A protein has these predicted regions:
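N-terminal targeting/anchoring "stem" of glycan-biosynthesis enzymes
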Residues: 1-124
Length: 124
């Protein structure tokens, strides 16, 4: 996935960053980084809570397991990031992904289409 989307992101003149929390020694440094994020994407998990520190209108792409419990209103806790993004005015996309455990099969074409629609060209 990363190899497939990097050229698209860089062609639109955006910086492509794979987040590593160890690079930010202070909360202030982390918040400064997050305030400049245009797109956050990854598998469903607690790191998405950081979207609260991002600009309004950030694009959120969440990879959701195909498991029925993740798509049931009886298990609505899994909808928390959709709800948070909606309340913050962010653009939310859920990409249902197969696989098991920590390995997910993400549809690269779907992610590329979302990025094409979400990233504006900042070409000079």
């Amino acid at each position: 996935l990363l190899e497939a989307i990097r050229p698209l992101v860089e062609a639109k003149k955006y910086e492509f960053v794979v987040f590593d929390s160890h690079k930010y020694g202070t909360v202030d440094a982390l918040f400064e980084f997050l305030a400049n994020v245009d797109v956050i994407m990854g598998p469903h998990g607690g790191a998405f809570y950081n979207m609260i520190f991002m600009r309004r209108g950030t694009t959120v792409i969440e990879f959701m397991p195909r498991s029925p419990s993740f798509h049931s209103t009886a298990e609505a806790v899994h909808l928390i990031f959709y709800l948070q993004a909606s309340l913050l005015g962010d653009k939310y996309y859920s990409v249902v992904s197969g696989g098991s455990g920590s390995n997910m099969d993400v549809d690269v074409a779907v992610v590329k289409e979302i990025l094409k629609d979400s990233l504006l060209c900042v070409c000079l």
